[in-house]
Amino acid sequence: MTHSILEPNGLKIQTPAGVVLHTGDWKIDESPVVGKNIDVNKLQQIGKNGVLAMICDSTNIFSFGRSGSEETVRKSLLKIMGRLKKKIIMTSFASNVARMETIFHCAEKTGRQVSLVGRSMHRIFKAARQCGYLKNIIEPIDPREAKNISREKIVYLCTGSQGEPMGAMMRISNYTHPDVLIEKGDAVIFSSKIIPGNEKKLYKLHNQLVKDGIEVISEENEFVHVSGHPNRDEMKDCLLYTSPSPRDS
């Protein structure tokens, strides 16, 4: 399967009554940047042999069309980062390795270095490297070293995209982070979706940053994120591939 994490898998569960297919989190992405698109042939093969029921990721059931490709986000972020002239502080889900590679790619293309901030970012980066990913990118630099680099030559990739109190982004915005200082004229890019329930604290964070003279860029005003979950058309495709038996709820 394809998702914003690496190497996701669906489960084919053989039961006495028949096969149950559990998709896990997934989407269809013809150009996922990191990893592979879903194995359509395998899904069709499972469908031909009969599927009693499918338990399917329906996070975006109310979103029409398709979720979009990571490659299109890369092109958009490259344009955005290319026009910004001061320090960039970017936050995303640490587990989204494709987005991480995208940010390293865009940083190199725009003459910037990357500094990872937050334990989860370092942990996922290390795990991805150990699994053979993130090989052809520039090396990240320590946040303490990044303080000596001019503002237009650095991008910080931080944890805390959902406004977590102890996340790096919140500490930076509160001016309590020991290594990253945010200044008037800098830009913060929220390259993630607001998880339902986090709206209030994130909008409060956005407002505080704007009040301090920081440019805030999010999916509400720029194209900076695609979901790791399927929209309706992708769910329809999966139903056609697998042909699970109709079930009345």
How would you describe each model-predicted region?
Residues 1-147, 167-177, 200-202:
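His/Asp/Glu-rich metal-coordinating catalytic cores
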Residues 87-92, 189-191, 243:
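Short glycine-rich or small-residue beta-strand-to-loop segments that form or flank ligand, phosphate
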Residues 133-136, 146-207, 211:
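Active-site neighborhoods of metal-dependent hydrolases
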Residues 213-228:
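Generic long, charged, amphipathic alpha-helical segments
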Residues 241-248:
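Conserved small/polar residues in nucleotide/adenosyl-binding loops
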